[in-house]
From Swiss-Prot:
Pfam hit, one: Innexin
Gene symbol of the encoding locus: inx-6
Mode of membrane association: Multi-pass membrane protein
GO molecular function terms listed in the Swiss-Prot or TrEMBL record: gap junction channel activity; gap junction hemi-channel activity
Organism for this UniProt entry: Caenorhabditis elegans
Keyword Cell membrane (UniProt): yes
UniProt name for this protein: Innexin-6
Entry superkingdom: Eukaryota
């Protein structure tokens, strides 16, 4: 038992190292975390049911021995089945008889695994782009979060906490901005906005894949429609959706003849598929809508910098500022990427640590501005204006 717990802890530690990332906004968490976990776990459980137990059981003639029974079950599971209501006669023509074919259940675990991978791609792209920008945002968020966790209970005095932030996290963030600026960190906000656009597009694509997997000739919005059928008592025997009892045709070869046999099969997987697909239909709609709203929100923020500036001003208004530079000078020192970093700090850490970080960064801003590493051709006039104030 101890070895099993140790193995689980080791796996969790490995996952946490591989997927180090800020918490992100709601849409990001829904896409890259919650939905990925839902789809991955569903895929694993459903795939295991293909190999453990009997996903399909067919009613074979009495003269079939155990080998024939096993063959029929395996054949019908792999080849596919079709649905005909039990109160209707089977048509003689194969095309007419198999009109309502059931072909999805073999592929559902693999489709879910693919969807889980696709839902993580926007986060992967964002991590790749932020790595290209030269600034490790995840490490910065983690550093400030750890510092706040270690120091918030040591002293509850505002000035003491603020001094602690001025000594470590603020310098750390300013140094990160300085070093990244010397590389190519000019587009972090644009990169993040592009990742939210891809999240929204990807969510709708995944919703389309789900609807195509269970293409219904009766319903356009089959999620609410099938749920309505269940609430009204119209089960699979009436609608044909997720049927539990299906038909399967196979040929028995004999010398000089081929005999067609039709058997009834119990498709127990559809009991779970029905509930799971109804849940996923509504869930993916929810994720797609949230992702779309989030996408437009970040496009607006990209075009309008006042949101991040307003958040910072709100934090600065909560305490007296030691620095003599103006708000506009502070925003100019931060730059577009600095404003984005501060916005991400507020988003991931919450208002209290973000306010301490903002105020302390403002207090030591002039030291950063006057450092030789900060001065470049773009900012020399600005530095001169700071020194003359």
């Amino acid at each position: 038992m101890a070895s099993q717990v140790g193995a689980i802890n080791s796996v969790n530690a490995l996952i946490s190292r591989v997927f180090v990332q800020p918490k992100g906004d709601l849409a990001d968490r829904l896409n890259s975390r919650v939905t990925v976990v839902i789809l991955a776990v569903s895929s694993a459980l459903l795939l295991s049911s293909h190999f453990i137990g009997d996903p399909i059981t067919c009613w074979t003639p009495a003269q079939f021995n155990a080998q024939w029974v096993n063959f029929v079950n395996q054949y019908c599971f792999v080849h596919g089945t079709y649905f005909v209501p039990l109160d209707q006669q089977l048509a003689f023509e194969e095309e007419e008889r198999t009109k309502v074919s059931i072909q999805y259940y073999q592929w559902v675990p693999y489709v879910f695994a693919l969807q889980a991978f696709l839902f993580y791609i926007p986060r992967f792209i964002w991590k790749a782009m932020i790595a290209y920008s030269g600034y490790d945002l995840a490490a910065a968020v983690k550093y400030v979060d750890r510092f706040w966790s270690e120091n918030r209970d040591k002293d509850d005095k505002f000035k003491t906490r603020l001094a602690a932030f001025e000594g470590r996290p603020s310098v750390y963030i300013w140094d990160g901005i300085r070093l990244a600026r010397k590389k190519r960190s000019r587009n972090m906000a644009l990169f993040y906005t592009l990742s939210t656009v891809w999240q929204a597009v990807n969510a709708w694509i995944q919703f389309y894949i789900l609807t195509q997997l269970l293409d219904s000739s009766i319903y356009t919005l089959w999620g609410p429609s099938i749920l309505g059928d269940l609430l009204q008592g119209n089960d699979w025997q009436t609608t044909g959706h997720f049927p539990r009892i299906v038909h399967c045709d196979f040929n028995r070869r004999r010398p000089a003849s081929v005999q067609l046999d039709t058997v009834l099969c119990v498709l127990t997987l559809n009991i779970y598929y029905e509930k799971l697909f109804i849940f996923l239909w509504f869930w993916l709609v929810f994720v797609a809508v949230v992702s779309t709203v989030n996408c437009f929100k970040w496009i607006y923020y990209l075009c309008n910098k006042t949101k991040a500036q307003k958040t910072i001003k709100n934090y600065l208004s909560t305490a007296p500022i030691k620095s003599t530079i103006s708000d506009d000078q502070f925003f100019s020192a931060l730059g577009e990427d600095g404003l984005f970093i501060m916005d991400q700090m507020a988003l991931n850490l919450g208002d209290i640590p973000a306010s301490y970080l903002t105020i302390s960064m403002r207090n030591i801003c002039q030291d950063f501005i006057e450092s030789e590493d900060y001065i470049d051709e773009e900012r020399t006039p600005f530095v001169k204006s700071i020194k003359h104030t």
